[in-house]
């Protein structure tokens, strides 16, 4: 479990912090960022998450916040200054994930595809590494939209189904995903209850272009979108350099056959949507 400390004695929220006072690539002390960001290897994933944090800091109201996290275990991807002034409500279908969550004020054992809140409840809905695991993404997104206040934001972080890693994930058995997490990423608890990888569906709305089309027809404006190299690549280059070199070579060959500047290593994306 990530190390957590209380940020505000008058607030029940806790947030991941580090005592290391090094400086992040955006010039801010690392203590201002959650452990989830600090754990990312240097590269596009970290840069995009820093950009996301900047947008959330500037676009969300400077007052207390109501946040709905759709699926939430022991890790928060929100900037600490947002968590300090937020009442976070987590909904997750996995009892183990709920049990390990220690930063939310309210945890609900439920299905984000069917669970509904009163209209206009939240300033921010965050769904991070979740929609790829849902069979009915549309139902979940409709619920997110309905629960959002006017001008509120939805942050989605998800894998790109059209990337190299997305195609492999979609067309390989779950046991292979567990093997990859254990022996390539070095996560010995992979596949155990409450630990990733979780079964993946890749509903059509996980594809970014489809997601943006859905957003447009449901009164949502895209204010940030970024496809970036999956952090798995720099991790592999450090842990398994021979395997990483082979995969990088394969990716370059595939890229050479694709139009434009397509990079099949862009395995993940961030998108922020604002309710008009």
Which residues does each PLM region occupy?
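Conserved N-terminal segment of class I S-adenosyl-L-methionine
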Residues: 2-120, 124, 227, 264-270
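Short glycine-/acidic-enriched loop or helix-start segments at secondary-structure transitions
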Residues: 78-80, 100, 136-137, 165-167
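Short, surface-exposed basic-aromatic patches at helix termini and helix-loop junctions that form
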Residues: 82, 145-146
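Conserved SAM-binding loop
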Residues: 90, 133, 156
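Active-site micro-motifs of SAM-dependent methyltransferase domains
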Residues: 114, 132, 163
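A short beta-strand submotif of the Rossmann-like class I SAM-dependent methyltransferase core
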Residues: 124-130
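Helix-to-beta-strand junctions that scaffold the AdoMet/dcAdoMet cofactor pocket
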Residues: 134-135, 148-150
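S-adenosyl-L-methionine-dependent methyltransferase catalytic module, highlighting the catalytic core
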Residues: 138-139, 143, 153-274
